[in-house]
Amino acid sequence: MPAESKAAVRLAIGHVLFIDIVGYSRLMIGEQSDLLGVLNDAVREAGEFRSAEADGRLMRLPTGDGMALVFRDSPEQPVRCALEISQALKNYPKLQVRMGIHSGPVNEVADVNERANIAGAGINIAQRVMDCADAGHILLSKHVAEDLQHYLEWRPYLHDVGQCEVKHEEIISIVNFYTK
């Protein structure tokens, strides 16, 4: 067994924002590149992203047609970041994204290129939450919504959607995060 496998897995809670460009695979390669560039710019310009990155409390994972952003401090961070990105993308109607947010266990791993990466249920469930979304939606796991509902600032924007069947016939409870 390799030495890395014997090392104790250090689990942490990650607050994950998963973002996907809707219809990406149907686009021409040039369009894919252009839209991914616009999305990357919007993400890098988001204040919550820049703040967490400057503090060394953010991990970025490209997914080909989007990304996962793993914040380390608070479930509010991915929500604020999603709002900032959504606002920035209003200027680009051709770029339709969907977003999913979940807080859960994650652990750092080395990827095939031996670079730091992150894995775990926190990432997986955030992606499943996002998979339930349509273009323009920001969906939260029920877990994140329950954390946020204790704050007056967030409560008016939380709208229970119910349950969604995702990969492996798993059922998850989701909440739509909606502002005007």
Q: Would you name each region that the model predicts?
A:
Residues P2-R80, E84:
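Catalytic NTP-binding/metal-coordinating core of nucleotidyl cyclase/transferase enzymes
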Residues R44, E48, A68-T179:
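Catalytic beta-strand-to-alpha-helix segment of the class III nucleotidyl cyclase homology domain
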